[in-house]
């Protein structure tokens, strides 16, 4: 009995939250007498503990979801659930949270966040953001780095399975580019696009995106 209590005491916050989800809301089956909408609402409420209400995260650990592309959100939630997205933060925070999400619940969660108003970045004029804008709009031809806007859109709004980057936390974007470059987050296209970026160039383009 003492060992069980000790295990509960040593659960990390993400693991504890994951247990709450697994027990309470994320099976994707509506409670008796309830509805699928109720299940989605309950799950979104749990999501808000990290991503904040309406997906307007204030912590760079957790991405802003408000206004994100629905198709992208669906793909990522399915990847978390199926453990095919395996970067360290995905494993720590999202594998447990998404473990029992059904496809209909995932669709409802994605639709909810996609319908929210995106967080606007804070425009900052600096040499760093100017350099980042150039990478975003023109790429780095000498290093075979394409313009980010060619896929993500002129305003970094994304399209379908291609994510919105505008107004996202700089630290989060930096972490993702580093994960793509190292293949900790598997994506062949993004690996090719990011593997030759220097830390300074990553800092520049992510600083610019955070201002949009």
What are these regions (language model features)?
Residues 2-15:
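Bacterial N-terminal signal peptides that target proteins for export
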Residues 24, 37-48, 66-67, 75, ...:
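Sequence context surrounding c-type heme c attachment/ligation sites in exported
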Residues 14-24:
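Bacterial N-terminal signal peptides
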Residues 26-44, 56-61, 114-141:
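Electrostatic cytochrome c docking/interface patches
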Residues 58-64, 80-117, 122, 159-164, ...:
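Axial heme c-ligation environment in periplasmic c-type cytochrome domains
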Residues 47-54, 109, 145-155, 205:
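The canonical Cys-X-X-Cys-His
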Residues 33-83:
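The feature marks the first
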Residues 27-31, 36, 74, 115, ...:
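Predominantly soluble domains enriched in secretory-pathway, periplasmic, or organellar proteins
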